[in-house]
Amino acid sequence: VTHRHEPRGASGRAERAVAEPIRGAVENGRVRRPSRDGLTIEQAAAIESPREFRLSPDGRRVAFTAEAAGARQIFLMPVRGGYPEQLTATEKPASDPQWSPDGRRIAFVCDEAIWMIEVEGSHQALVTQHPAGNRSPRWCTDGHQIAFISRRRGWDQLWVVDAPVPRRGRPATRPRSAEPAALTKTGVDIDDYVWSPDGRQIAATSQRLPDLLTSQIHIVDVATGQQRLIAGEVSWETGPRWLPDGSGLLMITDEDGWFQVVRVSVEGNERTALTTGRREHGEPGGGWGYVPLPSPDGKRFVCVEIHDGLVDLLVGEMACATGTDPLRAGESGSAVVSPFEGIWMAVGWLPDSSAILAIGSSDRQPDDLWLLPMPEAIAEGAKPRKLTRSLPTVVDTAHFAVGTRIAFEARDGLVVEGTLYLPASAVGEEATRVPCVIHSHGGPTHQALRDWLPFRQLVAEAGMAFLSVDFRGSTGYGREFRWANRGEWGHTDAFDVIDAAHWAAAQTWCDGRLAHYGASYGGYMTLCVLAEEPSLWRAGIDLYGDSDIAESYRHGDRPGRIDLERMMGKPDDPEAAPAYRRGSPLYRVERIEAPLLILHGRKDKRVSPLMTEKIVEALEIEGKHYQVHWYDDEPHGLKKRENGRDAWKRCLDFLRRHVLEQVDED
């Protein structure tokens, strides 16, 4: 569903002084088009990496999800090489595959229900389902129970259910699913959890009202449901993983202002730092792939180190009674096991602790699975081995734009960093000046990583620079920077983005034509910066962003509402209300000058479609130049390949028309 509006008798774009382009940028009155040999939208949409890799208990196979016939299915593949075997055949997407301890079964999620399937046979059984949804299935270490998270009582509670018994012959009737039991009480949302090696306890992460500035870890007794706090009283602590012998856990904490890996006792009264320094060794969500993993022999651990928009994988010794020095940020070259600069996430250790299974990507390579040897093996000549190949042969990445780190001082003196991607036409002896697309990431508690993002390459292929900005509030720069936009949404963080645009316009490679692009919080930033400094922009693209954050608090889903409350307080609080109003671009629509493209999914629960409906109504009233397109079958984000392809085309066409001012040669 598409709607266009162009003001009568006006171009919808304010006049701007544009730097004179270097000779060669314009030929015969037309903007020179990029080479036809570059990446196409069709190629970019066809690149689909496997996801959600899970290593089998014996280390011989890996389960993962990949698209097949329009839905993601679970596949199995030998770690040492071989052709993938499709395990599931479901109409709805399958996700989150989890091996049973004996390696004979896999639990997974499909259509918000928990299912189990036998690895060597066709038997598939329903574990549990509920209209409120179910997620995160995890096997008890004895294989007799499966825990999961469900909102069936209105909160993200931990539940436990008996696992279906492996098939022994064909049953005469369809067995009835066991009834699950709640393990944690209502009133608390569980974010993540992990079983202890003996199956008697669970370490669970949660954020508990009214304190939203800490993340806590509790040990839950499976038999009684009693909980014991071991971490997070005064800091953000998450990502717990049990040591193999059950004597303690690894986790990440920002106690010193940066996310570090620590070893903590089961009682929580003893801690040992395993990393140190001014770099992040985890992220606030404690997300899969970013948590520290102890080796099976208990002697080592693997963790991430985030810097300069990159994520390295480090291996360190388990510091305990030996007094081994912790890994120090920026000085751990010999401990880095990731083979190239990019974004790395640990999947798991081989059972003999000899290697790590990991996912690696970069701005030139999509996600692929790798087997990474230990540092001593690398010193003896062992090499990392790539197990999957997601990039089609027809796609030549040699000409792809590669990120360059930049930094500038914001108007209040804060140093803000980002990553710049220049098109080929802006590099070399015959370089021409080019426009620049400023990109704000989502979150905002996130950062713009130098990972596989086809749209930035498509922008570069079209002849425009692409500058991703880590405005205040981004992760990767320590706690002080991460909290720097508390109470400041749409204000000082928007100033950072505007200052980045001014920095870009002053560079010799830029011709002064600027656009802003972003999704989710980045889409919200589009509206904010276009309203804050209208004459700066040639175009803006808003993908499912907020327009009125007070109304978003009232109409969005619970996780989004809690995030807003953490960062801005409650909109009905008289002290917070002015900041909510200031941070809502809906009330400044009359200031917007640049043409605006808005894309949104009708099933979005995080950013309610009401946000786009309200901004479109205001744009219509003010007679602004805009286009809006709705995806009737999409939630927050564009999940379907065909919709992603359509969105890329709409965005590029919009930029070509309003920034490049290209004339259709046909």
Describe each model-derived feature in a short phrase.
Residues H3, P21-L39, R61, T65-Q86, ...:
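Beta-propeller blade-edge and WD-like acidic-aromatic loop motif
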Residues H5, G9-A14:
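Short linear segments in intrinsically disordered or otherwise low-structure-confidence regions
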Residues G12-R13, P21-I41, A45, T272-G298, ...:
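Extracellular/periplasmic ectodomains of large secreted or surface enzymes and adhesion receptors
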Residues A46-A63, A89-V109, P131-I149, W155, ...:
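Conserved beta-propeller blade repeats
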Residues S390-Q507, D511-G512, A519-S520, R554-H555:
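Cap/lid segment of the alpha/beta-hydrolase catalytic domain
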Residues F471-D666:
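Active-site-proximal cap/loop segments of hydrolase catalytic domains
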